[in-house]
Amino acid sequence: MIEILMADDHAIFRSGVRRLLSDEEDVRIVAEAANGLEVIEQLRHRSFSLILLDINMGGRSGLETMRRIRAEWPMQSVIMLSMYPEDQYAPIAL
């Protein structure tokens, strides 16, 4: 089972991703976060197979959150999400 933490500051987007993945047998969104601070708090309490992380969120950006995740949980799998049409954030996120 792939257990996902979905992190995005738009509740409608989180709901859409949840709905999209609901038909997948081996995938579950088990937690949500509206900002980077909530992501870090969630990681302090449990582990996840995968984090879907928005690049631009309030509270702490996805890029800042990614740096923190890499420092404290270096083996954590993360997929960065962006609505930006440019790929300017790709090298930073890597």
Residue ranges and their predicted role:
Residues 13, 58, 82, 86:
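The feature encodes the CheY-like receiver
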Residues 35-38, 59-64:
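Acidic catalytic/metal-coordinating carboxylates
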Residues 64, 85-94:
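Alpha4 helix (beta4-alpha4-beta5 surface) of REC/receiver domains from two-component response regulators
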Residues 41-42, 63-75:
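Short amphipathic alpha-helix used as the core "switch/output" element in two-component signaling
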Residues 26-34, 42:
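Short hydrophobic/Thr-rich beta-strand motif most characteristic of the beta2 strand and flanking loop
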Residues 5, 30, 79-81:
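Conserved hydrophobic packing residues within short motifs/helices of P-loop NTPase cores
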